[in-house]
């Protein structure tokens, strides 16, 4: 079938297998061109490995450090008549390229929040790898079923304490829109912490430690975004911020446990990028469009692969990691450059329906958004027939 992009709201409901493969190939080529990561990881578990930063973490480990990788995610296969999810095609492509290079790559498809997926992951590590020396936690999910109580939690994106007026781009109509977000209830805050806080990361590390599958000196990191004052009302000071603060608390206990084995645990702060998650946040398309404009003009623009490869090379495995006062690893310093933020802040209030394309890089934002789903990739023939039924040969289905 011939597959074209079909966008509904902030989700593209079609995906292109060949485009997803080309996107993965581009990221692999970036890593190979930058050269090996000195003293990098050798056996890596990535939880949330199929898109965005998690996929970039898997690619950087495999092609920057010749690491064996085990990826965990929750994706949907395609059929002859219906496309699967982008993460499915990304993983099929990643495994193909890794296998061609003689690298171990196996994936587990299921609910990473569940005990069943944790146990199956441990079985696969014991069988194939013995132990892992890096665990990357990069889950982005709207809901979580608690593995012990069975309670279902849903995350909410709201301010805390008071309503907030937000500017944003209505990405469908391409107009500037002001929205009011009402404050989260305590229940909504608690739910958001349960989904996006550090409890599940802690459960993963506890399970891996108990099973004896974490190597001496093993590291773990969870990815997060903090942002600057423009996004603080909705991020750091909002319901999601409560979850981020929980992550900062939980990492202390995890670090203590791993330190006993000569290892380490860190929260890694990454820059704002276009992801399926960020496109759902009312103000982020406008913020990202302005950020891209300013950072591209300065020559400091980066996407997922540049960020994560840099994080590995400079901080996770570098001699002089970029640490903040809270002990987090920082890869977002180019975004937080005062010159960049001041310029974004100035343009923020100047954008109108008439000058969106002039003052922002909204066209670059739209291209990046479509690239998530395998579209707008150079060299791909989008008029060609493509089979959406793509297999992942080594997939473990839970």
Curated annotation (Swiss-Prot):
Regions annotated as coiled coil: none
Positions marked as site (Plays an important role in discriminating NADH against NADPH): 75
Segment forming the signal sequence: none
Residues annotated as binding substrate: 225
Gene3D superfamilies: NAD(P)-binding Rossmann-like Domain
Catalytic reaction annotation: a 2,3-saturated acyl-[ACP] + NAD(+) = a (2E)-enoyl-[ACP] + NADH + H(+)
Binding residues for NAD(+): 48-53, 74-75, 111-112, 139-140, 244, 273-275
MF GO annotations: enoyl-[acyl-carrier-protein] reductase (NADH) activity; NAD binding; trans-2-enoyl-CoA reductase (NADH) activity
Pathway(s) the chain acts in: Lipid metabolism; fatty acid biosynthesis
Residues of the active site: 235
Top EC group: oxidoreductase
Annotated EC: 1.3.1.9
GO BP terms, alphabetized: fatty acid biosynthetic process
Alphabetical keyword list: Fatty acid biosynthesis, Fatty acid metabolism, Lipid biosynthesis, Lipid metabolism, NAD, Oxidoreductase
InterPro entries found in the cross-reference section: Eno_Rdtase_FAD-bd_dom (IPR024906), Enoyl-CoA_Rdtase_cat_dom (IPR024910), FabV-like_NADH_b (IPR050048), Trans-2-enoyl-CoA_reductase (IPR010758)
Function: Involved in the final reduction of the elongation cycle of fatty acid synthesis (FAS II). Catalyzes the reduction of a carbon-carbon double bond in an enoyl moiety that is covalently linked to an acyl carrier protein (ACP).
Similarity comment: family membership: Belongs to the TER reductase family.
Oligomer status and interactors: Monomer.
Annotated protein name in UniProt: Enoyl-[acyl-carrier-protein] reductase [NADH]
Source species of the chain: Paraburkholderia xenovorans (strain LB400)
